[in-house]
Amino acid sequence: MKTAFFQPDIPTQPNDHKILGNVLPGADALAISEISEQNQNLTVVVTPDTRSAVRLSRVLSELSSQDVCLFPDWETLPYDTFSPHQEIISSRLSALFHLQNAKKGIFLLPISTLMQRLCPPQYLQHNVLLIKKGDRLVIDKMRLQLEAAGYRAVEQVLEHGEYAVRGALLDLFPMGSAVPFRLDFFDDEIDSIRTFDVDTQRTLDEISSINLLPAHEFPTDDKGIEFFRAQFRETFGEIRRDPEHIYQQISKGTLISGIEYWQPLFFAEMATLFDYLPEQTLFVDMENNQTQGERFYQDAKQRYEQRKVDPMRPLLSPEKLWLNVDEVNRRLKSYPRITFKAEKVRSSVRQKNLPVAALPEVTIQSQQKEPLGQLRQFIEHFKGNVLFSVETEGRRETLLDLLSPLKLKPKQIQSLEQIENEKFSLLVSSLEQGFIIEQSLPVAIIGEANLLGKRIQQRSRDKRKTINPDTLVRNLAELKIGQPVVHLDHGVGRYGGLVTLDTGGIKAEYLLLNYANESKLYVPVTSLHLISRYVGGSDESAPLHKLGNEAWAKSRQKAAEKIRDVAAELLDVYAQREAKKGFAFKYDREEFQQFSATFPFEETYDQEMAINAVISDMCQPKAMDRLVCGDVGFGKTEVAMRAAFLAVMNHKQVAVLVPTTLLAQQHYENFKDRFANLPVNVEVLSRFKTAKEQKQILENLAEGKVDILIGTHKLIQSDVKFNDLGLLIIDEEHRFGVGQKEKIKQLRANIDILTLTATPIPRTLNMAMNGIRDLSIISTPPARRLSIKTFVRQNDDLVVREAILREILRGGQVYYLHNDVASIENTAEKLTALVPEARVIVGHGQMRERELERVMSDFYHQRYNVLVCSTIIETGIDVPTANTIIIERADHFGLAQLHQLRGRVGRSHHQAYAYLLTPPPKMMTKDAERRLDALENLDNLGAGFILATHDLEIRGAGELLGNEQSGQIESIGFSLYMELLDAAVKALKEGREPSLEELTQQQADIELRVPALLPDDYLGDVNMRLSFYKRIAAAESKAELDELKVELIDRFGLLPDATKNLLQITELRLLVEPLNVVRIDAGTQGGFIEFSAKAQVNPDKFIQLIQKEPIVYRFDGPFKFKFMKDLSDNKVRLEFVVDLLRTIAA
């Protein structure tokens, strides 16, 4: 900001301490920005808590031209049994590393973090490794260096501090780096360093060098552990021999949770942040820091007293881990500093006041006769310029609407420097609390909080990357030994692992399946397309078939007959839908791209696929009916907005139907936001509007003056008349009642319909999978960095208190779910007594609606930080600061519901926690235990879709699909049922009767006696190998195989011969599919190709071959074509068979 609004008096000498008074709420960021611009050195800002540090870093990033760095807190409680998330350690190490050379900029941290003792600067200096392209480095030596630096060896690199070695490739994700890297070695030289995408694992850009920081804030190599042991013995004396004792655990290299609280034992002497700072650093200190610092230290002492009694975890005293406030003050005397005070101070050499004044009351009072009275009065009497600050583009539109009665049209400016040129201006920024700058021409800054009451501090969401929703249901990657699988020809067996067998000197890998009576079946990996996971009931109730027995064939025959009827019924519905004529929307590429460009995040792969599918549906003349299924917070709303944009640009109206008023309000704000710069009128029908306003909206709707209308079931009442409705968007359809669904059906006649859902309830999942509705899955996990940590715990006051404290101390909020309205108030009282630090409020569905809105709104605006609630929050509003959910009696909920509830948290850049509280195991059903296990283990997937299929396994298919079908599914498994159904629908569409032979069509049996596998020294992880085998076997074209080949080379290095053979044999299978070949067999002396009786091949090809080389070729019976030739070389044999088949197929 070039026009300084006040001249700060910058102290430069040690212990030169100035006071800046009159720093009103909101003005602190402006004052810091001015100070750091004028200061020639680094400015360190110390805040009373994490929340204010986060707020200031957000505002300063917008206002200041300086680099702004937030040094994060561990986000754990003193002496916690949790460790900080890797992401936090990564940011801290990176900040400390760069701090040593920082000359200027703003460095923010809360007082509790300034009090923390840290690793000494030498630790980082000596343990940073610079790796450059062209360096000579033995890969095994590099592996040892990584181990010594605390990096974890994994199969696939996903998080900071991990590495993986595959042949000549080394993947690693250095601490402090935004992306992971892949190093390609040629002998002992680094041939290339490339970044790669965590989700697809494919490489991106080439770079020349990387800095490798250690993986922890303490050394974990042998020397470090040895030093720890000596210090531990010296500190605590006698050691228990119990293997669970922390000393024994760390001695054998186990980094236990909460190990950070023994960090001083890894160093001869600890440092503090002061040891990292340049001498001339200027400190800016907030008024409440002393009080908060003392409170934190007292809290640490109290927790030390409570916890030091655990003989397995003897604790270090607080002074070993933190400085107390007196020590901090003493250290601060070595630096120049400025302390902010809210009150005015008496002016002197040391003390100065910030030239600002408080705004008078300008709140909009919607209940009053003249809502804008106070604002009007202020503007009429104020002699200077007025700047309105709003947080987003959409709120800018809302503000302009609000100001229209005053005939005000503020000019939008891009930065504070432009204030002076305009009487009324408007800035999109995070300055939410206003004040008046007193100068020759005063400036009044009016923030949203001044006009609308305190608003929430939004935390930015992360840009999200994506994984391809790889045939999740049929994928074998999750298989565990002993789980049931279905073989198309032999029925249901149990998975026994991958085994390598040597037959006639040729190594090949097989999938071992165990059947009844201890029979074993070895399935070659080239036939994995015949295998699918058994889904359809619990593992225990899955059948176990006998090999070579008729039972399986009968089950399959029976299921196939039933499936034919289902397919016919489906097609009937499908045909009716196809016959429905819709409106073919026109697509203007340029307009659409301009709108898309205003989306503030990067679209994920799935999101793009879903958007493209929706747009392409809308441009067809038939009516769209598409289900977009994606987890809570995965960007389904953006898909809906793009569809709405296309409809509105085609002069059609859009209705958005949502289950709750609060959700309607939130969608309204989001839509307003996105359509802010367009001539689009967005309205909402909800109880927030007066009867008069609702009437006006309905009149405008009928006249076509409203483009997008958002609302609850009010939208489908008979008095709502659209002028020209073109698109209906339904959010969470399963939440509407039967009567409401009927009304929606009547609306459906010929308009395009887009349904959004977070948990595909399996019935809708099935319909979508069968193509009655088109389905797009957005399975992109929320930013992979911080998935939701889920704990299943027996209900215990200590667990609850810790969980709530951990969250509110980092400035967050907690949902406490107690699903019994009769006792909910008692629970709230109990919590208030248990955690007096919390501000508790109650919300449930039996409250009067107005009251519930107020509760939710108060929680949203952070007036309370614990909401004791019923399942009303299931489709709640987005509260980005709520990052812990505690669910009582979690064993009473279904999987989909628990998943949905858990999705209410984890929407910002903080680690989110879900605690599922249960009674003792004796009081739970087996199913409930399995549900909770599934949820605890699925914390890192875009799991809504996967959970729906898990639900099919746990609940069985019966209650989901109606009993008629469930019998068939129990007997043959869900995956196979779906495959057969697909084939039946396809046949009927083409006007053919589906035959069982066709449904269970055999693929050619190919035996060429060459090694064809993914060797385990090439791809070590069994599940990943299984997954690739399945993907190779399921490939449907040469292009797909080529793509897999590129991916294998990119991720694991050059292909071994056996893998080249595997891909070539698969290509051969694709080549012979249309020829109806039953078997191909070739050995060292020749072989044969056997055709099925219904093969249709051109006999001329065979005649030409026999005439050309009668010694080599001949027929043996009507269906077997033989060749005799020396084929002892594997490569020659493979190429000969491929060429021969190409000739026949041509």
Swiss-Prot record:
Alphabetical list of CDD domains matching this protein: DEXHc_TRCF (cd17991), SF2_C_TRCF (cd18810)
A Pfam family this chain is assigned to: CarD_TRCF_RID
Matching PANTHER family: ATP-DEPENDENT DNA HELICASE HOMOLOG RECG, CHLOROPLASTIC
Protein's name in the database: Transcription-repair-coupling factor
GO molecular function annotation: ATP binding; damaged DNA binding; DNA binding; DNA translocase activity; helicase activity; hydrolase activity; RNA polymerase core enzyme binding
UniProt xrefs under InterPro entries: CarD-like/TRCF_RID, CarD-like/TRCF_RID_sf, DEAD/DEAH_box_helicase_dom, Helicase_ATP-bd, Helicase_C-like, Mfd, MFD_D3, P-loop_NTPase
UniProt-listed Enzyme Commission number(s): 3.6.4.-
Principal localisation: cytoplasm
Native species: Haemophilus influenzae (strain ATCC 51907 / DSM 11121 / KW20 / Rd)
Assigned protein family: In the N-terminal section; belongs to the UvrB family. In the C-terminal section; belongs to the helicase family. RecG subfamily.
SUPFAM superfamilies: CarD-like, P-loop containing nucleoside triphosphate hydrolases, TRCF domain-like
Secretion signal, residue range per the UniProt entry: none
Gene Ontology CC annotation, any one: cytoplasm
UniProt subcellular location: Cytoplasm
Domain Helicase ATP-binding: 617-778
Keywords, in A-Z order: ATP-binding, Cytoplasm, DNA damage, DNA repair, DNA-binding, Helicase, Hydrolase, Nucleotide-binding
Described purpose of this protein according to its UniProt entry: Couples transcription and DNA repair by recognizing RNA polymerase (RNAP) stalled at DNA lesions. Mediates ATP-dependent release of RNAP and its truncated transcript from the DNA, and recruitment of nucleotide excision repair machinery to the damaged site.
Binding site for ATP: 630-637
Gene giving rise to this polypeptide: mfd
GO BP terms, alphabetized: regulation of DNA-templated transcription; transcription-coupled nucleotide-excision repair, DNA damage recognition
UniProt motif (DEEH box) ranges: 731-734
Ranges where the Helicase C-terminal domain occurs: 800-953
Record carries keyword Coiled coil: no
